[in-house]
């Protein structure tokens, strides 16, 4: 079980892979940091087969990155813009993968929408920083969906 950010659409979404020279992470267990070099193209978008658990969109890719950078966010915004050429919207989800069925209540889904011409890097940063376990006393998850429209 872990957190996941994925993009979903009614049109196929292309997979994206980082250049092969970015195959390593520097992990410092003493201070709890991870460094992947910070290159703007050091992320992947891989087909996400479990999207049906969260959305009715037919196609999805999961974002795989060590952490947010503005340069990566700009590249993802360009990717979403390209996806909007063949679909009216792209959903961006931040969810907890698996295990939410163990709790008494279904997760709360928080939804928001933004037009692509108003979509900015901070929207991606904020989505990634959302707290999925923001109601700890009830042990109830929150999922977040930001719909980007043309």
Regions found by a protein language model. Give the residues of each.
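Structured alpha/beta or helical-core interaction and ligand-binding surfaces enriched in interleaved
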Residues: 1-150
């Amino acid at each position: 079980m872990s957190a996941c950010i994925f993009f979903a659409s009614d049109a196929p979404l292309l997979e994206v892979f980082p250049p092969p020279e970015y195959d390593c992470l520097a992990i410092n267990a003493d201070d709890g940091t991870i460094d992947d070099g910070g290159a703007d193209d050091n992320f992947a978008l891989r087909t996400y087969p479990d999207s049906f658990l969260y959305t009715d969109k037919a196609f999805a890719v999961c974002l795989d990155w060590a952490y947010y950078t503005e340069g990566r966010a700009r590249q993802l915004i360009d990717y979403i813009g390209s996806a909007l050429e063949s679909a009216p919207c792209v959903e961006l989800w931040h969810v907890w993968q698996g295990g939410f069925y163990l709790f008494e209540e279904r997760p709360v889904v928080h939804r928001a929408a933004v037009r692509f011409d108003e979509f900015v890097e901070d929207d991606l940063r904020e989505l990634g920083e959302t707290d999925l376990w923001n109601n700890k006393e009830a042990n109830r998850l929150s999922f977040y969906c930001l719909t980007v429209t043309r």
